Design a protein with these regions (language model features):
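Active-site helix of classical SDR
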Residues: 120, 156, 164
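Residue(s) in the substrate-gating loop at a strand-loop-helix junction
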Residues: 140
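Alpha-helical segment proximal to the catalytic Tyr-Lys
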Residues: 125, 169-173, 231
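Conserved glycine-rich Rossmann-like NAD(P)H-binding loop of the short-chain dehydrogenase/reductase
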Residues: 26-43
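Short, small/polar-rich loop/turn modules that mediate ligand/substrate recognition or access, typified
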Residues: 172, 177, 233-235, 241
Length: 247
């Protein structure tokens, strides 16, 4: 594999960190973003370095187009062009629609969906010019089936795949693929913090495989989609949920 640069938004989270480390293990030069004002970024980078990973991280407000543009300009100048973009940044503001405020709606839509436009817009022209590129959008099983208390999150995650399908038509003949992955319950710190009795009684019974997914399993799917071997896969939404939702 030629040395390629991958940009992972939200790379310091539980799933994002696994994506970063596993892609580095495959020989990619990995760059990630962090929210301006994030006081843990230096600590995270130091921790990664102690494990043998020399990542570079750049501040970017993924909800702000100009901030994303400035971030990618720096990456282009200091690292090189982005060959693979993993749109992984996301938040939740879970509550019933009755209780949801406009601010709760906007925060999730801007972070989870607007960010996909904001970041992809900065890198796509370069991918097309080089006749090679990968855009991988990390959605969710709840974008496929919906979830109680997640009208904002489910709408944003479903919207990501609409973006994937439409854009894949535009760049298919330019060597650029655009795909969505939709993870189910993955064993990140956020999920494993759920009380065990809730996991055992409410969540695991929904999953035919009877367990949580592993972050490295999701990372493995992304590595495949980023590879030359996946050149014939575009416009797809690939489920990785242990059979929780089949479509």
């Amino acid at each position: 594999m030629a040395k390629r640069n991958v940009l992972v938004t939200g790379g310091m989270g539980g799933l994002g960190e696994s994506i970063c480390t596993k892609m580095a293990d495959q020989g990619y030069t990995v760059v990630t973003t962090y929210s301006p004002g994030n006081k843990t970024a230096k600590e995270w980078l130091a921790g990664m370095k102690s494990r043998g990973y020399s990542f570079q991280a750049y501040p970017a407000d993924v909800t702000d187009f100009d901030s994303c543009a400035a971030c990618v300009r720096r990456i282009d100048a200091e690292v090189g062009p982005v060959d693979v973009l993993v749109n992984n940044a996301g938040i939740t503001r879970d509550m019933t629609f009755k209780k949801m405020t406009k601010a709760d709606w906007d925060a999730v839509i801007r972070t989870n969906l607007d960010s996909v436009f904001n970041m992809t817009k900065q890198v796509l022209d370069g991918m097309v010019e080089r006749n090679w590129g990968r855009v991988i959008n990390v959605s969710s099983v709840n974008g496929q089936k919906g979830a109680f208390g997640q009208t904002n999150y489910s709408a944003a995650k479903a919207g990501m795949h609409g973006f994937t399908k439409a854009l894949s038509y535009e760049v298919a003949k330019k060597g650029v693929t655009v795909n969505t992955i939709s993870p189910g319950y993955i064993g990140t710190k956020m999920v494993t913090a759920i009380p065990q009795d809730i996991l055992d009684s409410k969540i695991l019974p929904q999953i035919p495989l009877g367990r949580l997914g592993k972050p490295e399993e999701v990372a493995g799917l992304i590595i495949y989609l980023a590879s030359d071997e996946a050149a014939f896969v575009t416009g797809a939404n690939i489920s990785i949920n242990g059979g929780q939702h089949m479509s």
